[in-house]
Regions:
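Active-site-adjacent structural elements that line small-molecule/cofactor binding pockets in enzymes
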Residues: 1-269
Length: 269
C-alpha cells in the first residue's frame, strides 16, 4: 500500500482442491471459513494493533499446547497508507459468492458476461448483500477481459483478436480442476454453454488442447471481452456499468497498450 501510494487492493481466492492439495500441500477444507479468517486477520493487522484472533481455521497467536508456547500478540512494523485496505474475493460458486457479497470489499469474477451474470450469480449476490455491513459500502466488482479499440477491429480482424482468448478459456474450462470438480466448467455450463463446456473438457483432458480451444463458443469470446470500434465498446461499457461493475480489469491487445488505455479513458470520460 505504501509503495503504490495508497492504491493497493488485496485479492484473495480459495481456488480448488486440485491446486490446494497438489501444490500447497494442505487439505482443501473449509475454504470459505479460511478466506473469512484471512480477511478478519488482515483488517486487524492494518489497524497496527496487536493481533489476537481465534477463528475456525486461523488462531493467532497459537493456542496453548501448540508450538513452542512462545508466541505472543504482535503488530505490523510497516505502516500502510490506509488502515482499511480494500479486499477483493475471487469467488465463483454459490455460497462463496454469497460470502463475498457479505464480507469482502470487492468481487473478482471470471469470464464476466454483463448480460448473463445475473442468471449465474444473481441470487447469491442478493443473499450476501442483504447481510452486508452497511459501513463497508457497496460491493465493488472488477471485470473486463481483453481490450482492443478501433474501426479496424471488425470482421476477420476482430475474430483474430478474440481467438487469442481461446487457449486461456480452454485451460480453465477444460483443465483447471478434476473432471467432476472444475468450477470454471460449471460456470461455463451455467452461462448456457453446456455441450460446449463438456466438449472443451473432454478434448482438453484427452490432450487435444487445440481442439479444446476451438470448441470455445464464439458468443462467449464476444461477450467476455471488449473488442471492436469505439462506439461498440461504449455500448459494452454501458452494459458493464448497468451490471454493477466498478473497476475495469483489462488486458490491452492488438496494438500499443498505452494508446489503447487512452482510448478506453476517452470513452469512459
Amino acid at each position: 500500500d505504501f509503495v503504490s501510494g495508497g492504491r493497493f487492493i488485496l485479492c484473495h481466492g480459495a481456488t480448488g482442491p486440485q491446486v490446494i492439495e497438489g501444490f500447497h500441500g494442505v487439505p482443501y477444507e473449509n475454504p470459505m471459513a479460511r478466506i473469512r479468517d484471512y480477511i478478519n486477520v488482515c483488517r486487524m493487522t492494518w489497524k497496527r494493533e496487536p493481533v489476537v484472533y481465534e477463528g475456525p481455521t486461523v488462531q493467532v497467536p497459537l493456542p496453548e499446547g501448540q508450538g513452542t508456547g512462545l508466541g505472543k500478540p504482535l503488530k505490523i512494523i510497516n505502516h500502510p497508507v490506509r488502515n482499511d485496505i480494500p479486499i477483493f474475493w475471487a469467488s465463483l460458486m454459490g455460497l462463496s459468492v454469497t460470502a463475498t457479497a457479505q464480507y469482502a470489499d470487492g468481487w473478482l469474477p471470471i469470464f464476466f458476461d454483463p448480460e448473463k451474470f445475473h442468471q449465474v450469480w444473481g441470487d447469491e449476490l442478493k443473499a450476501g448483500t442483504a447481510k452486508r455491513d452497511a459501513n463497508r459500502g457497496q460491493l465493488q466488482i472488477s471485470a473486463g477481459g481483453m481490450v482492443a479499440i478501433g474501426d479496424e477491429f471488425v470482421g476477420e480482424k476482430k475474430q483474430q483478436i478474440l481467438d487469442m482468448a481461446r487457449p486461456n478459456i480452454a485451460l480453465y474450462v477444460g483443465g483447471m480442476g478434476a473432471r467432476d470438480k472444475n468450477f470454471y466448467n460449471t460456470i461455463c455450463q451455467k452461462y448456457g454453454y453446456v455441450d460446449e463446456a463438456i466438449e472443451i473438457q473432454d478434448r482438453y483432458l484427452s490432450g487435444d488442447k487445440t481442439g479444446a480451444a476451438g470448441a470455445v463458443p464464439a458468443e462467449m469470446l464476444e461477450k467476455t471481452n471488449l473488442v471492436g470500434p469505439a462506439g461498440e465498446i461504449k455500448e459494452r461499457l454501458a452494459a458493464y456499468k448497468e451490471a454493477g461493475v466498478t473497476h475495469l480489469s483489462v488486458s490491452p491487445v492488438g496494438g500499443d497498450a498505452v494508446s489503447t488505455v487512452e482510448k478506453l479513458r476517452e470513452i469512459i470520460d
